[in-house]
UniProtKB/Swiss-Prot annotation:
Subunit comment: Interacts with PCNA. Three molecules of FEN1 bind to one PCNA trimer with each molecule binding to one PCNA monomer. PCNA stimulates the nuclease activity without altering cleavage specificity.
Annotated binding of DNA, by residue: R47, R70, E158, G231, D233
Protein source organism: Fusarium vanettenii (strain ATCC MYA-4622 / CBS 123669 / FGSC 9596 / NRRL 45880 / 77-13-4)
Enzyme class label: hydrolase
Protein name: Flap endonuclease 1
Amino acid sequence: MGIKQLFQIIKEEAPDAIKEGEIKNQFGRKVAIDASMSIYSFLIAVRSDGQQLMNDSGETTSHLMGMFYRTLRMVDNGIKPLYVFDGAPPKLKSGELAKRFQRKQEATEGLEEAKETGTAEDIEKFSRRTVRVTREHNAECQRLLKLMGIPYIIAPTEAEAQCAVLAQAGKVYAAASEDMDTLCFNSPILLRHLTFSEQRKEPIQEIHLEKVLEGLGMERKQFVDLCILLGCDYLDPIPKVGPTTALKLIRDHGSLEKIVEAMEKDPKKKYVLPEDWPYKDARDLFFEPDVRKADDPECDVKWEKPDMEGLVQFLVTEKGFSEDRVRSGGARLEKNLKSSQQARLEGFFKPVPKTDAQKAAHKRKLEEKNEEKKKKLKQEKKDKAAAKSKPRGAA
């Protein structure tokens, strides 16, 4: 699910943090990709009759088709993808997963009804909602990646958190996912729409965390607190707290501790906290996720030559793909994986870490920016109140 309305807030408050460009702009870069999110997007690309792509035996092949051709497109454009699969979900996420399961059950019932009486749009809508990435989908995609020579890692828990660790360590340029909570896990750069189909004509969004924090006038802890308030996978949202209110609460109070205290002391009880709302546990999951360290041998990956005959056996013999297309794709893969060894110029220069003095100056700058925003909001309130108190018709 990610973080509700976070992209919209960044777009409005920190527009300089977002760059949009073509896939070819990522040439020569290694990217850690949230595999489960990608597979889900391949599976929901259903036809208007509500059916996924299938072979003659009636087996779903949408996930394999998407994984093969979208990965091929990335490699064609000089990108070296590293896929990261989800492990076991954190216990705190069980409530959200239960809700998703319930929604999928309801969608399945809705789909059956739509097939009887609904329009093509209804069928497509409900079909998307019933989609679930299974262990079999993951296992088949892992088998395919191995045959393609593309590395993958299975994270201990959340794939986005593992992608973020690899990006922080400089093992990859960025983490790629549609889930905005990748930024909460401290990924310096998030790429969105990287595994979308070419037909969708969606530009690649490149979001820089440092510029997000600068634009919002926040430190990372405040940013994570804002994301928890907006609504994340770990907790129920607070009723009546939307994006505008969440942003104002963080700017006024500075932390979730103070926000919770103010809500509990409010005699009017304008906002009522959910009965079980362990926000500190949620914050800990963002700051200390269960991940493999970047120097773990499992994270020491290589891009290998594809196994052409293995690809033909799996995709053509077992899954009914076109042999000509698979062989052509395998040849492109081998050729372009070699050519993507060419490094970008920026790869020769390591970023110099900030000194304590620079960090302190940056913190002061954020605090000053936050104070300016508070003063501006206060003045706007005064101006509104003054305008209301004026008699009608007064100049």
